[in-house]
Amino acid sequence: MASDSRDRETACMLEFAVQMTCQSCVDAVSRSLQGVAGIQSVEVQLENQMVLVQTTLPSQVVQALLEDTGRQAVLKGMGSGRWQNLEAAVAILGGSGPVQGVVRFLQLTPERCLIEGTIDGLKPGLHGLHVHQFGDLTRNCNSCGDHFNPDGMSHGGPQDSDRHRGDLGNVCADADGRAVFRMEDELLKVWDVIGRSLVIDEGEDDLGRGGHPLSKITGNSGERLACGIIARSAGLFQNPKQICSCDGLTIWEERXRPIAGEGRKEPAQPPAHL
């Protein structure tokens, strides 16, 4: 089952690369995170241009705080603790429309999985979010298969015992069309979903309670807006890269360019979460 109650959430460790050149940079970064609810500890390493944050906040929120100092920040890894890396994954969502986003998965404990991310381009309101059976994008999101359901259950909400394992409930987009979320789930395991897909839908998931013929199948949440394959990603201290071997871009140059495609050759202004 999933949880989004702040007092029940499990803190994770976020590893950021932050452009810092002097002690005043360190002081500014430290002040930006000082006293922020949901941040439990901060370690700033000038020599490594690294900031470690133990927090229950979404990584996008912490990154925005760091970049409010006028310095670029790149999330390089996540972990459940400094000395433990169970498994981590990421899905980069896109489709034929304007919806795009990044969603990260982290196995906090053998029994508890963190799902957090930012999705842009949505209509304000609730949108169903689900892990689907296949990592097949040959027909955009229509080839992703049904909800991930190895237990043969009916569709339900993340708090229900009778639910698909891929049922993550709803995320809420604000007036600007951005959904920033963090949830924990006791059924989903990162190692079970790598290679599958994550899909965001056009409407609200009724959590199996709507009485519609699709309620117990899909939650009647409408068309699939955007999707991405769930792939392994770096845990803490597992991503030492400073320069991309494929094209020679530094992590700071990558921060201001698309992840792939022709646009990567020229500077571009990306969404803040990429």
Curated annotation (Swiss-Prot):
Residues 11-74 form the HMA domain. Its main location: cytoplasm. One of its GO terms (cellular component) is cytoplasm. Pfam families: HMA (PF00403), Sod_Cu (PF00080). Ubiquitinion by XIAP/BIRC4 leads to enhancement of its chaperone activity toward its physiologic target, SOD1, rather than proteasomal degradation. XIAP/BIRC4 preferentially ubiquitinates at Lys-241. Homodimer, and heterodimer with SOD1. Interacts with COMMD1. Interacts with XIAP/BIRC4. Interacts with SLC31A1(via C-terminal domain); this interaction is Cu(1+)-mediated. The heterodimer CCS:SOD1 interacts with SLC31A1; this heterotrimer is Cu(1+)-mediated and its maintenance is regulated through SOD1 activation. This is Copper chaperone for superoxide dismutase. The lineage of its organism: Eukaryota, Metazoa, Chordata, Craniata, Vertebrata.
